[in-house]
C-alpha cells in the first residue's frame, strides 16, 4: 500500500475534505526562515519525537553519537546527524515506534584543553585555580555548550526525544561507569602497573595508541661510539634520539649474529654519563638484519626496551619528565627541553669524537591527536584494561552476522585491528572526567568500590586518598548504548529499547568507540548493542577533517541561515556516498536550495489548479492519458527505489532518485505535458479533472517521499494542501503501488522525451532560437510508427515542430539515431543548408561519450559494485550512441 490510499496518507480523495478552500496560500517567495522554527516547536509540543504507536507496532532505536561539549557543532557533525534523522523520520512514517536518544559527551582531554586555552587568554593557569575551581569552570562551560549544541541540532530538524537527553557525567551514567570499572577490576580485566605509555607533554597525560597520529618524518640517524671492555674499536650504536641515551641501562645484541659475537659478556661505558652498561643477548629486541646489530636499551623511554628490561631485570632511568624537559637524572642537561637537550648532547658527542656521523632517516613519528605535540614514550604508573578476553566475543559477533558493517569493506578493517589488539591504557592525568574509583589507605592498601569507602576493608584505616586520575573518555562512551537507558539498573527503558538497531557514525571512530561498544555491550549485557553500523565518510575542509580543537570548524548555522536547513540536509544526503570523504561547497548548497524552490513552485502551481476547481478524488477506473499513466508509474517506481536505497543506507542514491523524479519527471516532464489540458487549450473537462487529480496525488506522495530529507519545507506545503498541520511527520510513507506500474507508458514517454531533447539540442547546435520551428522526420518499423504516431500531439507541443512526418529525411537534413529510430532534422527553407561543422561537433561529442562509457564497462570495479540495472542501462546507452555515431558519420560524409 502507498500514500495514495486515504487510510494511509489522505491523498487524492480525502485531502479535499480537509482543505479550507479560500485558504492560506504558499508565499510567492520560498523563505524557510518563516516556518522552520515554528514546525520544530509544533512537532515537539505534539510529542512527535517520542516512541509512540499502536500496540504491537515494531520499534526502531538509535542513540546519537554524543557530541563533545567543547563548543559548537561543526558542519561534519551535522552531516552524521542528518543521516540519522533521515532514518528516524523514514522509519516513523513506516509505522515504527521510533526512539532516537540525544546527549553529549564530557570529552575529558578535549574539553580540558579548550578550557585551558580560554584561561590562558586571561593569563590564568589551571594549577592556580586548583582542581575544584577548575572543574567548576568546566561545568559552567558545559552548560553553555550543551545549550548551543542542542540549539544547533534543533535548527537542523533532528527528531530526537529530548525528554531522554543524557550527558556522560550525569549521576546515573557516572554510576554505570563506576559499576563497569569495579566489575572489570574484580574479574581481573582491569589492572594497575608501571609501563611505558604514550605521553603528551602538552596535555600532561597518557594517551592511548589510538590517540597517537603517526606521520612520516625526515630525521637524522646519529651513529655514536660506545667504549666496550676488551673491544678496542668499541661499539657503534645508531639512534634518532640521542637525548634518551642518558637513560641507557644496557646494550643488546642478537645471540645468533656473528658480527656481534665479540661483544658477548662484555661491559660498555655510557658516553657523557660514564655508567657501566651490560651487553645483553635479546633475539626479540634486536633485528640482526638492520643496522650494526647492536642497539641501546633505554627502558624508561621505549616500550620495546622496557619489555627487554623486564626480561633481563635491568634498571629503569627516567631522563625525560612529564613536561618534556630533562630530569635530574640527565645531570648537566636537567631542565632543558628534550629537543634542546638533543642539540647540546650532539655537540658534546662531536667534541669528544664519539659522533661518527649522521645519516638521513625517514620514519614514522607519533603526534598527539589533540594538540599535535610529539609523543614521548614515558614510564609511569597507569590503569589498563586487559582487552584480549573482551575482543574474542566481539570478533565472533561480526563473524556470525550479529553485527554488520555498512559499507561492508569496514569488516576486514575491524577484524585486522581486533585480532592485533593491545591492552588499553584507561587512566588520564586530567581533572575533568570520571575519577577512577580506586582509593589507597595510609598503609598502602588499594580499595576499588562503587561507593566511596569510609575505611580500608583490609586494615580499617580511615585515612583514604582517591586516585587523582580520571578515566579515558572512551571508557564511559563505550557504555553509552545501554547506560542511557539506566543500566546497570533493570529499568523499563532498558527492557523496551535495548539493544538498539542502527548506529550511524564516522569511520574514524571505528576503533575508538564502535569496537569498544561491541565489546562492552556483549560483556555487560550479554548481547550486541546494535545490529547494524553505518560508517559514513568525513566532511573535510581543505583536505582536513573538521575539528574544534584544530580551529577549522564551519558552523552549520551559517549554512542554514543562507540556504535553509532543508537545503543543507538535502546536500548532505546527496553527498553521502560510500567513500571516505564528503565534499561540500557552495555550489552544491545552492543547487539544493534551487531544488527546494522548484518543489515550492510546483506546489504553488498545483494549489492554484486545485483551489475551487473540480478534480478527480479517486483515480481508480478513470480514463488516464499517457502522461498520467507515465507519471504514476514513475512515482511508484521512485517510491520503491527510495525505500530500497534507504534500506541499504545509500542516502545519495535515494536523494538522486527523488531529485530526478521531482525535478525532471514531475516538474519538467508531466507539468509541461499537461499544461495545455489544464489551461483548457486541449482536452475536455474530464481530462482536466483527471489531470488535477493526478497532480494532487503526485504532490501528496512526493511530499511524503521528500519529508525525511526536507522536513520543514514538506510540512509547510502539506499544511496548505491538506489543512492538517504537523501531521506529515506521522503520515504513511509511500512504498510504491505495483498497480500503477506501466512499462509501456514509461517506454513511450522515454522515447518522446528523447525525441524532444534531440530537437532542442539540434537548435542549440545550430545556434538558433529555442522557438525556431524545426522539421522532424522519423523512419521506423510499423510497430514503432504506431507508437510514435500516438505521441504526435505531445511531440509537436513540446518540441515546437513546424513539420512532422514519417519517412526518410529530406535532402540536407541532419540524420541521427534517437531511442532506436532514425530521424532527420532540418530548419525551414532558407536555413536548411547542411552545417558540416555542427555535424562534426556533434560527432566529436558522441565519440567522447562512447569512450567514457566503454572505459566504464571495461572497469572490473564498476561491473562488480554497480547495481545490475545501472550496468544494463550503461550498456543500452552505449549501443544507442554507437548507432548515433553511425548516422552522424553518414551525415558528415554527404
Question: What is the meaning of each model-derived region?
Answer:
Residues 147, 153, 594-607, 626-638, ...:
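Core structural elements
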Amino acid at each position: 500500500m502507498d500514500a495514495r490510499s486515504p487510510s494511509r496518507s489522505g491523498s487524492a480523495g480525502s485531502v479535499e475534505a480537509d482543505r479550507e478552500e479560500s485558504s492560506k496560500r504558499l508565499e510567492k517567495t520560498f523563505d524557510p526562515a518563516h516556518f522552520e522554527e515554528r514546525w520544530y516547536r509544533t512537532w515537539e509540543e505534539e510529542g512527535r519525537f517520542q516512541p509512540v504507536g499502536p500496540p504491537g507496532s515494531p520499534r526502531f532505536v538509535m542513540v546519537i553519537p554524543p557530541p563533545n561539549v567543547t563548543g559548537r557543532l561543526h558542519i561534519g557533525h551535522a552531516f552524521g546527524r542528518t543521516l540519522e534523522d533521515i532514518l528516524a523520520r523514514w522509519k516513523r512514517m513506516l509505522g515504527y515506534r521510533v526512539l532516537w536518544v540525544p546527549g553529549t559527551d564530557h570529552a575529558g582531554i578535549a574539553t580540558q584543553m579548550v578550557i585551558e586555552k580560554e584561561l590562558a587568554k586571561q593569563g590564568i593557569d589551571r594549577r592556580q585555580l586548583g582542581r575544584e575551581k577548575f572543574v567548576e569552570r568546566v561545568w559552567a562551560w558545559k552548560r553553555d555548550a550543551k545549550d548551543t549544541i542542542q540549539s544547533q541540532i534543533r535548527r537542523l530538524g533532528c527528531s530526537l526525544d529530548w525528554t531522554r537527553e543524557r550527558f556522560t557525567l550525569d549521576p546515573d551514567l557516572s554510576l554505570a561507569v563506576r559499576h563497569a570499572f569495579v566489575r572489570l577490576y574484580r574479574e581481573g580485566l582491569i589492572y594497575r602497573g608501571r609501563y611505558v605509555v604514550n605521553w603528551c607533554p602538552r596535555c600532561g597525560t597518557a594517551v592511548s595508541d589510538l590517540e597517537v597520529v603517526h606521520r612520516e618524518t625526515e630525521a637524522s640517524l646519529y651513529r655514536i661510539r660506545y667504549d666496550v671492555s676488551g673491544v678496542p674499536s668499541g661499539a657503534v650504536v645508531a639512534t634518532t634520539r640521542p637525548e634518551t641515551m642518558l637513560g641507557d641501562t644496557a646494550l643488546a645484541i642478537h645471540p645468533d649474529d656473528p658480527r656481534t659475537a665479540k661483544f658477548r659478556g662484555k661491559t660498555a661505558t655510557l658516553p657523557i654519563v660514564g655508567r657501566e652498561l651490560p651487553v645483553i643477548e635479546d633475539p626479540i629486541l634486536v633485528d640482526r638484519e638492520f643496522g650494526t646489530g647492536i642497539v641501546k636499551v633505554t627502558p624508561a623511554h621505549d616500550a620495546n626496551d622496557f619489555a627487554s628490561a623486564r626480561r633481563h631485570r635491568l634498571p629503569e632511568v627516567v631522563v625525560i619528565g612529564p613536561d618534556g624537559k630533562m630530569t635530574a637524572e640527565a645531570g648537566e642537561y636537567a631542565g632543558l627541553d628534550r629537543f634542546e637537550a638533543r642539540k647540546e648532547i650532539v655537540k658534546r658527542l662531536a667534541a669528544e669524537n664519539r659522533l661518527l656521523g649522521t645519516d638521513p632517516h625517514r620514519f614514522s613519528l607519533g603526534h598527539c591527536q589533540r594538540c599535535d605535540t610529539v609523543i614521548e614514550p614515558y614510564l609511569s604508573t597507569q590503569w589498563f584494561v586487559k582487552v584480549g578476553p573482551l575482543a574474542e566475543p566481539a570478533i565472533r559477533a561480526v563473524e556470525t552476522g550479529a553485527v554488520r558493517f555498512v559499507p561492508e569493506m569496514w569488516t576486514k578493517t575491524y577484524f585486522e585491528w581486533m585480532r592485533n589488539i593491545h591492552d588499553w591504557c584507561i587512566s588520564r592525568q586530567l581533572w575533568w572526567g570520571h575519577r577512577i574509583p580506586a582509593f589507597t589507605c595510609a598503609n598502602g592498601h588499594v580499595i576499588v568500590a562503587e561507593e566511596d569507602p569510609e575505611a580500608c576493608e583490609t586494615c580499617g584505616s580511615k585515612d583514604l586518598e582517591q586516585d587523582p586520575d580520571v578515566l579515558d573518555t572512551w571508557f564511559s562512551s563505550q557504555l553509552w548504548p545501554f547506560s542511557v537507558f539506566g543500566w546497570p539498573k533493570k529499568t523499563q527503558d532498558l527492557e523496551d529499547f535495548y539493544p538498539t538497531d542502527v548506529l550511524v557514525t564516522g569511520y574514524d571512530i571505528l576503533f575508538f568507540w564502535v569496537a569498544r561498544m561491541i565489546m562492552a555491550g556483549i560483556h555487560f549485557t550479554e548481547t550486541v548493542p546494535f545490529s547494524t553500523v553505518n560508517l559514513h565518510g568525513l566532511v573535510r575542509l581543505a583536505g582536513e577533517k573538521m575539528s574544534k580543537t584544530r580551529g577549522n570548524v564551519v558552523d552549520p548555522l551559517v549554512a542554514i541561515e543562507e540556504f535553509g536547513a532543508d537545503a543543507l540536509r538535502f546536500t548532505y544526503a546527496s553527498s553521502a556516498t560510500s567513500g571516505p570523504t564528503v565534499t561540500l561547497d557552495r555550489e552544491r548548497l545552492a543547487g539544493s536550495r534551487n531544488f527546494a524552490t522548484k518543489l515550492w513552485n510546483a506546489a504553488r502551481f498545483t494549489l492554484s489548479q486545485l483551489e475551487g476547481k473540480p478534480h478527480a478524488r479517486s483515480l481508480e477506473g478513470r480514463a488516464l492519458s499517457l502522461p498520467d499513466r507515465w507519471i504514476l508509474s514513475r512515482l511508484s517506481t521512485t517510491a520503491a527505489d527510495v525505500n530500497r536505497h534507504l534500506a541499504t543506507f545509500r542516502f545519495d542514491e535515494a536523494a538522486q532518485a527523488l531529485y530526478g523524479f521531482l525535478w525532471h519527471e514531475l516538474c519538467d516532464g508531466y507539468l509541461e505535458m499537461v499544461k495545455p489540458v489544464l489551461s483548457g487549450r486541449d482536452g475536455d473537462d474530464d481530462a482536466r479533472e483527471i489531470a488535477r487529480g493526478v497532480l494532487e496525488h503526485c504532490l501528496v506522495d512526493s511530499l511524503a517521499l521528500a519529508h525525511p530529507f526536507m522536513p520543514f519545507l514538506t510540512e509547510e506545503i502539506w499544511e496548505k494542501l491538506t489543512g492538517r498541520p504537523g501531521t506529515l511527520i506521522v503520515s504513511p510513507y509511500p512504498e510504491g503501488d505495483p498497480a500503477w506500474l506501466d512499462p509501456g507508458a514509461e517506454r513511450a514517454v522515454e522515447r518522446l522525451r528523447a525525441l524532444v531533447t534531440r530537437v532542442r539540442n539540434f537548435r542549440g547546435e545550430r545556434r538558433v532560437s529555442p522557438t525556431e520551428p524545426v522539421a522532424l522526420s522519423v523512419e521506423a518499423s510499423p510497430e514503432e510508427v504506431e507508437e510514435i504516431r500516438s505521441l504526435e500531439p505531445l511531440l509537436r507541443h513540446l518540441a515546437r515542430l513546424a513539420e512532422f512526418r514519417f519517412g526518410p529525411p529530406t535532402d540536407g537534413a541532419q540524420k541521427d539515431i534517437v531511442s532506436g529510430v532514425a530521424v532527420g532534422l532540418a530548419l525551414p527553407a532558407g536555413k536548411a543548408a547542411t552545417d558540416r561543422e555542427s555535424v562534426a561537433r556533434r560527432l566529436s561529442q558522441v565519440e567522447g561519450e562512447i569512450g567514457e562509457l566503454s572505459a566504464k564497462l571495461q572497469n572490473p570495479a564498476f561491473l562488480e559494485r554497480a547495481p545490475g540495472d545501472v550496468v544494463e542501462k550503461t550498456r543500452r546507452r552505449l549501443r544507442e550512441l554507437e548507432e548515433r555515431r553511425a548516422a552522424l558519420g553518414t551525415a558528415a560524409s554527404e
